[in-house]
């Protein structure tokens, strides 16, 4: 009731002065503060632990996908190839198609007959955000089969935030936005390895060595096609992917635990600071 304004919200000095604050006795204040501080410390320690686990995972990935460290039992040579040789199609949306038909058809909420319009902010590694900002009618999207996302493939950010690489998991059909490079592989099972390799040091160095700097940072489709990928044998690839997946699962469980702690803290604040729950 004290907030005013439509474009910019504000609170008047007088309204602030009239705000009623419930003040318990000093010893109870201290108990409440100490209880919340304990939870804060728990949350902060868990955040540090998660950061440490992520750093370890990143370091492990760099060592394994470059071949600097080999898992026990593997010593075969790695093959060097290019993304172009691994793919039946490497492409992107054209500006003409976007202006002529795609952009006018976009809607900001999912409707019957629409599919997600995936932008380069909507993907990273194995995560795809299907609940994105825009959706496109399928009858429009199907006119552009090359950029229709209806199979497991690679997505690469090629404009603005370049270097971001993900596996499109095909959990549902979607459509690629203009800043997204699409690499459709002959063997979709290679998508996870290619993503990990291009996300590692060697892959990122290649990507950024090809960037074109103008109004935005850009990669061309030709740049994407010539990206080199080093491939170990299938069994070694699967073993490396498995090790990193286990680490990802552990981190996900820790993040889930963190969210629970944060909810607990919010609940404690609502109960303790309103006096609904009193500490003895």
Label every model-predicted segment.
Residues 1, 10-16, 117-121, 131-199:
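A short beta-sheet element
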Residues 84-108, 121-151:
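Sequence-specific dsDNA recognition surfaces
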Residues 3-27, 109-112, 158, 173-181, ...:
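A short glycine-rich beta-alpha junction/loop motif
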Residues 18, 26, 71-102, 226, ...:
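Non-catalytic DNA-recognition/assembly elements of restriction-modification systems
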Residues 23-77, 228-280:
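Amphipathic alpha-helical coiled-coil/heptad-repeat segments
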């Amino acid at each position: 009731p004290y907030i005013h304004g439509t474009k910019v919200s504000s609170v008047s000095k007088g309204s602030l002065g009239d705000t009623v604050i419930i003040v318990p006795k000093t010893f109870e204040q201290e108990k409440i503060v100490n209880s919340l501080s304990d939870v804060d410390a728990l949350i902060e320690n868990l955040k540090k632990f998660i950061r440490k686990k992520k750093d370890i995972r990143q370091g492990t990935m760099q060592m394994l996908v470059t071949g600097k460290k080999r898992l026990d039992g593997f010593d075969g040579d790695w093959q060097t190839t290019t993304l172009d040789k691994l793919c039946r199609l490497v492409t992107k949306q054209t500006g003409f198609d976007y202006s002529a038909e795609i952009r006018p058809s976009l809607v900001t909420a999912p409707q019957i007959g629409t599919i997600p319009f995936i932008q380069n902010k909507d993907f990273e590694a194995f995560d795809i955000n299907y609940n994105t900002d825009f959706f496109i009618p399928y009858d429009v999207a199907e006119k552009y089969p090359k950029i229709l996302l209806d199979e497991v493939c690679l997505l690469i950010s090629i404009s603005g935030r370049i270097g971001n690489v993900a596996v499109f998991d095909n959990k549902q059909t979607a459509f690629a936005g203009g800043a997204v490079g699409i690499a459709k592989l002959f063997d979709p099972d290679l998508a996870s390895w290619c993503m990990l390799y291009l996300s590692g040091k060697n892959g990122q160095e290649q990507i950024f060595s090809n960037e074109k700097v103008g109004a935005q940072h850009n990669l061309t489709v030709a740049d994407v096609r010539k990206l080199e990928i080093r491939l170990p044998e299938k069994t070694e690839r699967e073993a490396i992917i498995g090790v990193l997946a286990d680490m990802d699962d552990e981190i996900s469980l820790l993040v889930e635990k963190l969210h629970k702690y944060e909810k607990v803290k919010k609940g404690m604040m609502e109960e303790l600071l309103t006096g609904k729950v009193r500490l003895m």
